[in-house]
Amino acid sequence: MVALVPGRGCGECNACCSYFEILPELNKPSGKLCQHWKAGCGIYESRPGVCRDFFCYWLQDAALGDDWRPDKSGFIVQETVTDIPAHFSIRKGLVFRLYGEDSAIDSERFIETVSAQVEKRVPVFLSVLGPGNAGTRTILLTDDLTGPVLSRRRERIVAVLHAALATIRAQ
């Protein structure tokens, strides 16, 4: 069972209800708000297991402040144990799924949080939805960000983030 931060809840946030594909259970494509969202989940008691089992990282980590709620930050943050490159000793990473505007990668909150994880050699990924129903596209950030983060050069960090976003947008 996932441990959740006491007193923290989704509230008006519906980021996961629109970002993720939920097939075949709800026939809901990625990037579209679930048809059952009505100022809250209209099928909460009978929602599919995939919805029942999902908790974004903001609900799990008290270190992420209230401004990290996905609808406020522009990111759905998730832990991951898949696709971690072999050269990482830490086998659990973080995926920052860009949910809002691309400019969210320029926020101090994002840069500081990602930089802190990169400094600890946590595998950090950036993910975006592809056009149409093309699914998600993900890129590892940690390796390319290590030098800029360790040198504390914000302009280089921002340049790497923009290059990574451009790369996955072009895929």
Question: Each PLM stretch: what is its role?
Answer:
Residues 1-171:
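Short loop/turn segments that flank or connect secondary-structure elements
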